[in-house]
């Protein structure tokens, strides 16, 4: 073999060339990763039914108030309903406050869902009283809740103190002790309606202590049957007590001394009424249906109905509607009851909720700082653009 050929052989010049590399077919783009949405939390029909029925009783109680002076039966119904309707509502509020942990998100909802509506409705009620009540000098005071707004103040305070009640060893006995002390303390005064805040406190704390199985117990068939004679006994006792008892005890807005009673009676009445209220609340829950009914959806709008019906309830007094003689007959009392139930039902409907959402559930993102995670997420998205 000649030298040039040998040289070419050594350098690989005579090697068989490799086949041309084929372009790999383009890979199909991977489908985008779909992040599953968290499941929508379904509302519990039982509690929505309970809230709706409780708020109907609240409206009926307000409608019966001007009638009880002329009708012992109306007075008995009034006392019976006032024994448990707000306690039931407050127990439910406490039960659904169990997860409150003072995190930024929950504090924001506390401000927008409780504090802001309080300011709006306190001012609105004041102007309504000036106009409809012919009291043009009635002052605006956020420290003196008028009529129904006391509940918003109380709920704000109760919910804000929830983390404290979750760490103390005996929350309910402590809450009862506070309520008893309030009932014998006339110097508490009227600021923020603290008497009601403190005297109704045990029902909120009771709700915090309850678990789902406790509600299952009162919803048994045996409990429903037992609730009937209990309510009948309560009505009979209320009929006997109506002309003998000061109904202001049920409002829990005054101390014993302010009701012209001896101081020791405040402790007795607070503990006795708490026991009676808890029994009737349990009987009320026993009768609440657990399935979805035509009024179940209205349970989401009970706070709307509660605050809005106050204008009609007070207006009926300002405008002397109850001066009509026929309203103080059995037929008139039934008519008032039906009208109160129909009114509160209408005020809990979705159209009314949409109309007044600006006042009850305002969007106020502009008023709050963004938390660190949200801010970092926003900066990261901006950099990727």
Kindly give the residue locations of the regions a language model identified.
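Alpha-helical transmembrane segments and their immediate juxtamembrane cytosolic regions
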Residues: 2-385
């Amino acid at each position: 073999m000649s030298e040039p050929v040998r040289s070419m052989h050594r350098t690989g010049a005579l090697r068989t060339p490799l086949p041309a590399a084929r372009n790999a077919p383009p890979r199909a783009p991977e489908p985008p990763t779909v992040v599953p949405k968290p499941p929508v939390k379904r509302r519990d029909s039982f509690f929505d039914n309970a809230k709706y029925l409780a708020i109907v009783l609240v409206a009926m109680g307000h409608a019966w108030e001007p009638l009880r002076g002329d009708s012992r039966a109306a007075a008995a119904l009034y006392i019976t309903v006032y024994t448990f309707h707000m306690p039931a509502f407050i127990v439910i509020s406490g039960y659904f406050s169990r997860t409150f942990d003072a995190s930024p998100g929950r504090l924001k909802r506390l401000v927008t869902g409780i504090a802001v509506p309080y300011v709006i409705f306190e001012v609105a009620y004041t102007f309504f009283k000036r106009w409809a009540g012919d009291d043009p000098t009635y002052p605006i005071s956020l420290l003196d809740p008028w009529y129904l707004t006391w509940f918003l103040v109380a709920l704000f305070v109760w919910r804000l103190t929830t983390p404290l009640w979750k760490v103390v060893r005996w929350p309910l006995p402590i809450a009862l002790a506070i309520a008893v002390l309030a009932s014998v303390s006339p110097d508490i005064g009227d600021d923020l309606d603290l008497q009601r805040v403190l005297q109704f406190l045990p029902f909120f704390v009771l709700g915090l202590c309850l678990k789902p199985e406790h509600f299952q117990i009162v919803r048994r068939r045996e409990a429903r049957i037992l609730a009937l004679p209990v309510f009948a006994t309560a009505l009979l006792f209320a009929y006997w007590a109506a002309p003998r008892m000061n109904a202001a005890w049920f409002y829990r807005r005054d101390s014993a001394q302010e009701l012209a009673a001896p101081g020791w009676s405040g402790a007795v009445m607070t503990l006795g009424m708490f026991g009676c209220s808890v029994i009737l609340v349990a009987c009320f829950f026993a009768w609440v249906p657990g399935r979805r009914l035509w009024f179940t959806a209205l349970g989401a709008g009970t706070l709307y109905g509660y605050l809005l019906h106050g204008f009609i309830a007070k207006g009926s007094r300002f405008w002397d509607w109850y001066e009509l003689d026929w309203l103080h007959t059995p037929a008139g009392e039934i008519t008032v009851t039906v009208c109160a139930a129909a009114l509160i039902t209408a005020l809990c409907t979705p159209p009314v909720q949409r109309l007044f959402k600006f006042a009850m559930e305002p969007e106020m993102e502009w008023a709050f700082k963004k938390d660190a995670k949200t801010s970092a997420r926003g900066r990261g998205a901006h950099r990727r653009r």
